[in-house]
């Protein structure tokens, strides 16, 4: 299973924002309830915590609250949302949360509340439905600067057209402002306001499900590669890094304040820069000896030296986007890697003693039994300790959507997407239903490594082996 995703929010930086001038405001950020693995083992909504921290840096009289629907049962969630009183409510949404996100404005009694919607679920869908649901502003791209400017604009009745990275209605016409530039220096972003999150609950859930307390953080943003199923509209293709000292500062907070035993880096590609990884490992060995951590990698960006150094510095897990053991499928997905590179990476991972994980995609149009057999053979030969299985989902805005949208079922509505565990393609696209393929690969993994599967780590779509 992929592990993953402080008070020090007054970090001094060079960004200058306009000063706020008017009276007290209450701002509530919401992560809606959703479906899928994160409802089973939720991760802190760090994106919302970054937004809160960006506001709190410049103003201490704001009342800010973060609500995570994943931590609440249905009745409690409805009670909390329907009784909210706030000047601004900001909602983040993935595609699987979007139907719930669209419902939130109708549940709020205060008709003067301004509603803001952002996140990966909203970027590439027509926005008319968002406005119809009650949202005043739609945000695109990184939001740390945008939320500060939007709050000032709402409070001081300034023109929204001067805030980059948003869209809104003016006289029934949509206005979309210029894109928000990426934040070049990630050290300029304050540490996420975890003090507004129920970190004790997140950590305790991970301890219960995984057997040890774990939490998540990021040390970079962006990915330069062009996988056809991936959307880079939020963080872009340019990779930007936090400094080693900034990373260590946040790690120490997690280890010391929240008593975690492991930190997982949710970076899209932790291993993109070898020198940075080696320097980071040197810093870890000096500042945090003996601490455990994990990360995501890409098979052609690692080598034996890097992995050995990572192991020496406390890395216990690395997950790779393998997707398939079939070169045909890899090429169709635009992965830009070779099967032999996958095998070599796992050979090194196993030699140095890091738990290696595979993200695998099932249900690719054109997938045959031979492709599935190749994936099973890759699993057998590579001996991953963890597998995470996903159906290929052609989300709007991705290249794979443009290539395969004519194969999507007529009943699929991405505004009401709840098929995270069901293929969105028509059944006639496949020789065998993807659900059966997924079971076949899972059963193969369990049977091949019988006796080594750790039931605590068989969560959602993830299955892992005992050490």
Question: What do these predicted ranges mean?
Answer:
Residues 11-24:
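Short, Lys/Arg-enriched N-terminal segments with co-localized hydrophobic residues
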Residues 25, 35, 163, 169-219:
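N-terminal [4Fe-4S]-dependent radical SAM core
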Residues 27-37, 167-170, 175-176, 355, ...:
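C-terminal accessory regions of radical SAM enzymes
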Residues 37-48:
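Glycine- and acidic-residue-enriched helix-capping/strand-helix junction motifs
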Residues 54-58, 63-185, 391, 397:
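Glycine-rich beta-alpha loop elements in corrinoid/cobalamin-binding modules
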Residues 70, 121, 266-273, 298-299, ...:
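Short, solvent-exposed turn/loop segments enriched in Gly/Ser/Thr/Pro and often Arg
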Residues 128-132, 306, 366-380:
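Catalytic cores of alpha/beta
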Residues 192-362, 377:
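Radical SAM [4Fe-4S] cluster-binding motif and immediate context
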């Amino acid at each position: 299973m992929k592990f993953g995703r402080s008070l020090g929010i007054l970090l001094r930086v060079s960004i200058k924002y306009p000063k706020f001038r008017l009276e007290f405001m209450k701002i509530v950020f919401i992560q809606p309830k959703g479906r899928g693995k994160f409802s089973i083992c939720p991760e802190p909504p760090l994106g919302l915590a970054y937004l809160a921290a960006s506001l709190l840096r410049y103003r201490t009289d704001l009342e800010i609250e973060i609500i995570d629907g994943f931590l609440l049962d249905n009745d409690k969630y409805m009670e909390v949302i329907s009784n909210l009183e706030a000047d601004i409510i900001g909602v983040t949404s993935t595609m699987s949360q979007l139907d719930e996100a669209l419902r939130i404005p109708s549940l709020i009694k205060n008709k003067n509340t301004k509603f803001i919607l952002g996140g990966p679920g909203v970027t590439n869908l027509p926005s008319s439905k968002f406005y119809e649901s009650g949202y005043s502003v739609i945000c695109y791209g990184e939001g740390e600067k945008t939320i500060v400017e939007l709050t000032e604009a709402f409070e001081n009745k300034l023109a929204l057209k001067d805030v980059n990275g948003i869209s809104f209605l003016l006289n029934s016409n949509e206005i979309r402002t210029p894109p928000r530039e990426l934040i070049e220096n990630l050290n300029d972003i304050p540490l996420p306001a975890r003090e507004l999150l129920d970190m004790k609950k997140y950590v305790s859930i991970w301890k219960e499900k995984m057997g040890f307390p774990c939490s998540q953080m990021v040390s970079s943003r962006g990915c330069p590669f062009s996988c056809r199923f991936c959307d880079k509209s939020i963080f872009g293709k340019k990779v930007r890094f936090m400094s080693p000292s900034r990373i260590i500062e946040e790690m120490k907070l997690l280890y010391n304040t929240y008593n975690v035993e492991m930190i997982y880096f949710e970076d899209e590609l932790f291993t993109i820069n070898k020198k940075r990884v080696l320097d980071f490992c040197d810093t870890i060995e000096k500042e945090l000896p003996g601490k455990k951590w994990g990360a995501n990698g890409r098979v052609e960006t690692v080598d034996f030296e890097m992995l050995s150094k990572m192991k020496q510095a406390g890395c216990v897990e690395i997950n790779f986007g393998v997707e398939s053991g079939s070169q045909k499928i890899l090429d169709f997905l635009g992965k830009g890697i070779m099967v032999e590179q996958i095998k070599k990476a796992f050979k090194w991972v196993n030699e140095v003693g890091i738990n290696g994980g595979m993200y695998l995609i099932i249900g690719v149009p054109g997938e045959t039994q031979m492709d599935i057999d190749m994936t099973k053979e890759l699993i057998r030969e590579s001996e991953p300790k963890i597998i995470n299985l996903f159906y290929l989902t052609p989300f709007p805005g991705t290249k794979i959507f443009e290539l395969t949208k004519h194969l999507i079922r007529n009943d699929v509505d991405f505004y009401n997407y709840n098929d995270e565990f069901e293929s969105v393609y028509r059944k006639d696209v496949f020789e065998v239903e993807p659900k059966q393929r997924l079971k076949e690969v899972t059963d193969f993994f369990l049977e091949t490594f019988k006796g080594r599967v750790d039931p605590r780590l068989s969560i959602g779509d993830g299955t892992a082996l005992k050490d």
